[in-house]
Amino acid sequence: MPVTVTRTTITTTTTSSSGLGSPMIVGSPRALTQPLGLLRLLQLVSTCVAFSLVASVGAWTGSMGNWSMFTWCFCFSVTLIILIVELCGLQARFPLSWRNFPITFACYAALFCLSASIIYPTTYVQFLSHGRSRDHAIAATFFSCIACVAYATEVAWTRARPGEITGYMATVPGLLKVLETFVACIIFAFISDPNLYQHQPALEWCVAVYAICFILAAIAILLNLGECTNVLPIPFPSFLSGLALLSVLLYATALVLWPLYQFDEKYGGQPRRSRDVSCSRSHAYYVCAWDRRLAVAILTAINLLAYVADLVHSAHLVFVKV
């Protein structure tokens, strides 16, 4: 049986979780005329326009451009699937928990589009010469920002409210799991060069911390999406609490060790960006080693805060079997 999560008081509500006072109509074209349906149409159109503008001029060279193009295409495709399921009333036949899947995707999509809206103009668009390609790239960035706001709005509308019975992924800890795994993926992208950490066992430990915490958080998300939380040998609430506490402790060590061994000269670090020859001049589609080290340090702090908030909010959840 699936696990449903509520906040302190268990109540039943027939109104939509968007708080707009009317339920989402499914299995009918009228689903598109409801506020949530219209919002998803905006998501669909904005991501479609973004990747179409870039594709029409081939403005996605390099890893950063490829990431942005993947983001828009992926978000468009999954949003289209969600709309089709809603229109045809196929929620019961969907292989994943419909109570958890849409908001999980919306949260990921908001983060994906946010990253594309920042990475694409800063690492790609600014290096384009003035002309049609640059104009299309700037317009694509604008529509990417619209998509980000639209997905974030869906998360705000459909997240759990106090006293409401809902899926775990709609709660604050569930949404924080999405943030934690997303930030970890960005960290992995920045440490893709083994030369950043292989020279020090302490830095290798940090990489192990990122991997362990990512895997545990991903398992929690997948168990909820697959509605198979009962397969664990321990109660699911205990698993979540232990996961959050362990992750806080592990990330605390990484937050100390990573900056210490990357930026302190006594431990072989490089305190000044000017000393890194790879940062001596601007490169299109490339982030120099010192900037990567700094980005990982900042992202480590962000994820530690996310895990602390996760641990605190998890104590306020009440789990019931349905």
Curated annotation (Swiss-Prot):
Tissue occurrence: Widely expressed. Not detected in thymus.
Cellular location(s): Membrane
Sites bearing Phosphoserine, chain numbering: S22
Entry membrane topology: Multi-pass membrane protein
Residue ranges annotated for the MARVEL domain, each copy included: 31-163, 168-319
Keywords: Membrane, Phosphoprotein, Repeat, Transmembrane, Transmembrane helix
GO BP terms in the entry: establishment of endothelial barrier; intracellular signal transduction; membrane raft organization; negative regulation of actin filament polymerization; negative regulation of gene expression; negative regulation of heterotypic cell-cell adhesion; positive regulation of cell migration; positive regulation of substrate adhesion-dependent cell spreading
A Pfam family assignment: MARVEL
Start and end residues of each stretch annotated as Disordered: 1-21
Segments of skewed composition (Low complexity): 1-18
Chain ranges passing through the membrane: 41-61, 70-90, 101-121, 137-157, 171-191, 203-223, 239-259, 294-314
One GO CC term on file: cortical actin cytoskeleton
Family of this protein: Belongs to the MAL family.
Name of the featured protein: Myeloid-associated differentiation marker
